[in-house]
UniProtKB/Swiss-Prot annotation:
Molecular functions (GO terms): ATP binding; phosphorelay sensor kinase activity
E.C. designation(s): 2.7.13.3
Organism: Bacillus subtilis (strain 168)
Taxonomic path: Bacteria, Bacillati, Bacillota, Bacilli, Bacillales
Annotated transmembrane regions: 12-32, 173-193
Descriptive protein name: Probable C4-dicarboxylate sensor kinase
UniProt xrefs under SMART domains: HATPase_c, PAS
Topology class, membrane: Multi-pass membrane protein
């Protein structure tokens, strides 16, 4: 049978109450000790004053001078003793003979106290002696005649009050303080325990431990990387999948995020208090899909959490599919174009114009070979070449001449930019150029594409003579969801283009005039910013 565990509320209450009682006892001991010292100091002062008073009494001086013990002296001294609450007053002459004493049988007898000798040499002092009923304090004072010659000694004694005496004397005050202290201590302990339990969401420590272990196990078993920081940019969560994605090891909890990851983009979430969803970033050659959300409590940002998904394999497949799709599109357009030309050639043959039909066939074959050979020679990436071929064919379908500068060249990709990025960038810019002709009525519709590459830069220029972009649209050109296409468009094309340019540390310039056309000029450094600064 399991014993019922004592709740944290009662544990805190009992512990706090014990601490209050212990503190009260310690305080009481210190206080009683101070009272004892004060009582001793006051007692010594009172005893010495009493001894001095007795030594100056005329009756005492006359009795000592005449060496005559009288009842009058004993009564006078006894009266002084009672007034000053002394236990005893002893008057002795220079022969140590007692003239007064609390025990009448001792009067007239010689005193043999070990602490008396100094008093007969005109010394004024105190002595203490422990007895059966406690410690007695004795004050010694010399008695002198008119000529200042010592004629005797006055000894006044009293037992120091013990702890029991002090407690008995202060019993009412102590009772009041005990009730007040313990009452407030009990109430305070209970309120403190209740407050702590409330701060713990009414959970017991073992329940919190279980929840923490479950949460930790859940985070580490997730297939997504999870990183959380507080408003001081200190890491509070860094699960195992995140360590795999970012290739880090060890216990990272408690470290500043900058020390572990240079580009987690979490600090900007804390600063701006704005969530970012499904953003693709590149880290260590990996394609990462990231969502970053601020953690808000009571309208105050207390941290941020990021969820990362490794999309590297998916991105590679997408790149392959993109290349295949571009070639398929190019073949579809080419097939459509060839079918039209074949019909034309068949018609010419039926009309008996065989030479003209043969000339048209050679012309079509030559054009196709020239375009294919040029793209194969100048554009080393198949996906990019397939994209450009499909756009050339599609332009012919739309009645738009797509020209690629004969000096164009693409041999390799800049650092931080890959095949997928170049295909997305070219595809979106060329599609935007196609869209600019939707409202244009012109015989000369033209798109010019130039791709120039050196050891230092990759420059891409795409120009069209379409409708252009309104000046009012320019500030929002790269905003997610914003589109200038009146007949459709998702608003993601130029947003993705800008993301790719930022990732590759590139620049983009737009020159557009309404009714005249638009040009996009993009420049990527072949080496990243860090490499350039290092060199």
């Amino acid at each position: 049978m399991n014993k019922k565990k004592l709740s944290i509320r009662w544990k805190i209450t009992i512990l706090s109450y014990i601490l209050v009682i212990f503190s009260f006892l310690i305080g009481g001991i210190v206080l009683i000790g101070n009272i004892q010292h004060t009582e001793e100091r006051e007692l010594k002062k009172r005893l010495m004053n009493t001894a001095r008073t007795v030594s100056e009494m005329t009756e005492v001086k006359e009795a000592l001078a005449r060496k005559k013990q009288t009842e009058a002296v004993r009564h006078a001294v006894e009266e002084i003793r009672m007034i000053n609450e002394a236990d005893y007053i002893v008057v002795m002459d220079m022969n140590h003979i007692r003239y007064t004493h609390p025990v009448s049988t001792s009067i007239g007898k010689k005193s043999e106290g070990a602490d008396e000798e100094a008093a007969f040499a005109e010394h004024i002092y105190f002595s203490e002696a422990k007895g059966e009923i406690g410690t007695a304090v004795r004050a010694f004072y010399p008695v002198k005649d008119q000529d200042l010659n010592q004629i005797g000694v006055v000894l006044v004694g009293k037992t120091l009050p013990g702890i029991a005496d002090i407690l008995l004397h202060l019993k009412r005050d102590i009772a009041f303080i005990v009730v007040l202290t313990l009452g407030f201590g009990l109430a305070g302990s209970f309120l403190l325990a209740r407050h702590i339990k409330k701060q713990m969401f009414q959970l017991e420590p073992h329940e919190i431990v279980r929840m923490y272990e479950e949460r930790t196990a859940t985070f580490h078993s997730m297939n997504e990387g999870v990183i959380a920081i507080d408003n001081r940019l200190v890491i509070t969560i860094f699960n195992e999948k995140a360590k795999q994605i970012f290739e880090v090891q060890g216990d990272l909890i408690g470290k500043v995020i900058w020390e572990v990851l240079k580009d987690s983009r979490l600090p900007e979430i804390v600063e701006r208090n704005k969530a970012v969803y499904n953003e693709e970033i590149r880290v260590s050659g990996k394609v990462i899909m990231s969502s970053r959300i601020p953690i808000v409590m009571k309208k105050k940002v207390i941290g941020a959490v990021a969820i990362f998904q490794d999309r590297t394999e998916a991105a590679k497949m997408a790149e392959e599919l993109t290349g295949v799709r571009n070639f398929v599109e190019a073949l579809r357009v080419q097939n459509h174009e060839h079918m039209n030309k074949l019909h034309t050639i068949a018609g010419l043959i039926q009309l008996g114009k065989s030479e003209k039909a043969l000339q048209l066939a050679f012309q079509a074959s030559t054009e196709q070979e020239n375009v294919t050979e040029f793209l194969h020679r100048s554009i080393q990436n198949d996906a990019a070449a397939g994209l450009l071929l499909s756009k050339i064919r599609r332009g012919r379908e739309l009645g738009i001449a797509v020209h690629i500068d004969e000096n164009s060249s693409l041999q390799q990709f800049p650092e931080h930019v890959d095949q997928h990025d170049i295909v997305v960038l070219l595809g979106n810019l060329i599609e935007n150029a196609f869209g600019s002709f939707e409202t244009v009525q012109s015989e000369d519709k033209r798109i010019d594409i130039s791709i120039e590459q050196t050891d230092d830069i990759l420059a891409i220029l795409i120009e069209d003579n379409g409708c252009g972009i309104e000046p009012t649209h320019m500030p929002r050109l790269y905003d997610k969801g914003f589109t200038v296409n009146k007949t459709g468009g998702t608003g993601y094309g130029l947003y993705l283009v800008k993301q790719i340019i930022d990732k590759g540390s590139g620049t983009i310039e737009v020159d557009s005039h309404a009714g005249q056309g638009t040009s996009f000029s993009i420049v990527f450094p072949m080496k990243g910013e860090e490499a350039q600064h290092g060199s």
